[in-house]
Regions:
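Hydrophobic membrane-insertion alpha-helices, especially the h-region
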Residues: 1-21
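Alpha-helical transmembrane signal-anchor/signal-peptide segments
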Residues: 19-43
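Secreted/periplasmic serine-hydrolase-like ester/acetyl group-modifying domain
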Residues: 30, 150-294, 398-416
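Catalytic nucleophile-elbow at a beta strand-turn-alpha helix junction centered on a G-D-S/GDSL motif
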Residues: 53-75
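Short loop/turn segments at strand-loop or loop-helix junctions that form parts
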Residues: 65-66, 122-126, 264-273, 312-317, ...
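Membrane-embedded segments
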Residues: 69-159
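Extended hydrophobic/aromatic segments used for targeting, binding, or gating
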Residues: 82, 280, 287-293, 297-361
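C-terminal regions of proteins
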Residues: 93-95, 329-330, 336-416
Length: 416
């Protein structure tokens, strides 16, 4: 007796979602809030970011990265853009543990919004660990809409095959596994396969629009992430005046340790394990990692979508580097490998701060920019975004998808 009404109710919900319109009304206030929410939902879900990035009256720019976006202070890019009413607003896309593979699949949800646009992309050398990042971290930021968006847009090329292979490695029980395996094996998808993908892609897109209208999680973050700092900054823009203000804030908030870290971070993340952390990173290397191949996925997408990115390479807090025993020569060799992969293919807009980790108040903690680091970031990024230019011609090299490159630790100029 109960089964019939439940079945009918389920069918009605399915039909409601399937025929729900995908376009959302633009609301600048809501879009500004979602842009700085820095929640898991704002990172991986489609509707809020697509709505903002397609707003004809405000230019939201994707800022891709990981957890650095959560380090807010008076010089944070979202704060400066709002305070000085710049021609753009950052849309912050990143979470702790996310790296290029998550970013690539997230991009599949918003390809029309990336076409011929500028973006900011932070590349942290810490991403390039021996085994890449944990499958659990990847899965946390992946969803069915990303999957069907990828399957719908894939072209059967080497990038698609590599992405499918990595997806199976990171998510062995992924939905539609048989289709992903076909791509990984370079098998052609059948007409029936493509029809199913299209049907599920439409459903996922409409489901995202339907539930996205109720998504307010993280909206309150706008006040504590942005509004609270606006009144601390001078009304007239001046780098020197802003530097004086954020430097005073940094001095006040790095007073309980000798490592130049924010007090709260030091108290909660470092202090209790300080002795154990001494020389704990002596054996770390970032030279051999699948992340180099994952990065190539992103570069391939940028080339296909004619995106003009600026890449940011952050430093490690120098005091922390020395204390933890992280080798400076290895770090710089990693940076050179990353830069070679970028520059040799035509991605030449790079702000390399990798040698600035010893500058006072440049870092918020061990590896994240803050205060004067954000100001240096702004001096590189704001002129780039305020004077938009088309993407240059890229010259992609598929060798960067190879295991040879992922594990190469020699002179980059000698790589064949």
């Amino acid at each position: 007796m109960i089964f019939g009404p439940v079945l009918i109710a389920g069918l009605l919900v399915f039909l409601l979602i399937f025929f729900y319109p995908t376009e959302m009304r633009h609301n600048l206030g809501a879009e500004k809030r979602s842009a700085v929410a820095t929640t898991i939902d704002s990172f991986k879900e489609r509707s809020q970011k697509v709505r903002a990035l397609s707003d004809p009256n405000m230019r939201f720019v994707p800022f891709f990265g990981s957890s650095e976006w959560l380090r807010f202070d008076g010089a944070h890019p979202a704060v400066l853009a709002e305070k000085y009413n710049r021609s753009y607003r950052p849309y912050l896309l990143g979470q702790r543990g996310a790296a290029s593979l998550n970013q690539y699949f997230g991009m599949q949800q918003m390809l029309p919004q990336l076409e011929n646009k500028q973006v900011v992309y932070v590349i942290s050398p810490q991403w390039f660990s021996k085994n890449g990042y944990e499958p659990a971290a990847f899965q946390q930021y992946f969803n069915g809409d990303q999957l069907t968006s990828f399957l719908e847009h894939q072209s059967g090329d080497q990038a698609s095959q590599y992405a499918a292979t990595r997806l199976l490695q990171q998510f062995p029980n992924v939905a539609m596994k048989d289709l992903v395996q076909k791509l990984a094996s370079k098998e052609e998808l059948s007409t029936a396969d493509n029809e199913m993908i299209e049907l599920l892609a439409r459903f996922n897109e409409r489901q995202a629009s339907f539930f996205g209208q109720f998504s307010v999680r993280g909206y309150v973050n706008y006040d504590k992430h942005v509004v609270k700092y606006l009144k601390t900054l001078p009304d007239q823009f001046s780098y020197q005046a802003i530097e004086d203000i954020v430097k005073a804030d940094a001095e006040k908030n790095t007073s309980n340790n000798d490592l130049g870290m924010e007090n709260y971070f030091y108290n909660t993340q470092i202090k209790k394990d300080l002795k154990k952390l001494k020389d704990s990173q002596k054996s770390f290397t970032y030279l051999k990692s699948p992340e180099y191949n994952d990065l190539q996925l992103v570069l391939t997408q940028f080339s296909k979508s004619r995106v003009n990115p600026i890449f940011i390479i952050p430093p490690v807090n120098k005091k922390w580097m020395d204390y933890a025993g992280l080798r400076e020569d290895m770090y710089q060799q990693t940076v050179q490998k990353i830069r070679y992969q970028l520059e040799s293919q035509g991605f030449t807009n790079i702000a390399d701060f990798s040698k600035d980790g010893g500058e006072p108040f440049f870092m918020k903690d061990t590896i994240h920019l803050g205060w004067l680091g954000w100001l240096a970031f702004d001096k590189a990024v704001d002129p780039f975004l305020s004077n938009p230019t088309p993407a240059p011609t890229y010259h992609l090299n598929e060798r960067f998808f190879s295991k040879d490159w992922a594990t190469y630790d020699g002179d980059v100029k000698e790589f064949q």
